[in-house]
Amino acid sequence: MAKWVYNADMRNLLGGKGANLAEMTNLGLPVPQGFTVTTEACTQYYEDGRQINDEIMAQIMEAIDKMEGITGKKFGDKENPLLVSVRSGARASMPGMMDTILNLGLNEEVVETLAKASGNPRWAWDCYRRFIQMFSDVVMEVGKKYFEELIDKMKEEKGVKQDVDLDADDLKKL
């Protein structure tokens, strides 16, 4: 079986971000729990017709299980959710060129839990709105402009100029 997921310091295999996070972890710096899917797994994904094969998926799920054990949180659990960020990386730094999805694991049930736990429903719904926008753009290839148009329309309807002036109910409607 090939190994697709690592926690080691290997820039060519892990990309710059993955290697830097691994190095910070090795130095004992406070880094959130995580794992890196290798550049070889990405190559395999394309060779498999843009599908994640069973072997890679099994290792990703194993890494998520390990994160759950360490954090005490569970991916997909509405009461104690594990939220993750997915960041792409290359060997060399390419600011603004690589995709990111924050708060993977949020859904309509989890966002309600997050709103109650944080005491800040506006923040929770804004996180969810941003997650949907990022996921739609990066994964579903739905352009950001459609979301920006909806936000602009909502601001116009509410008579406000800034996104931060929209309240939790506004963001929930979006």
For each predicted feature, which ranges?
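Nucleotide/phosphate-binding sheet-loop regions of phosphoryl- and nucleotidyl-transfer enzymes
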Residues: 1-174
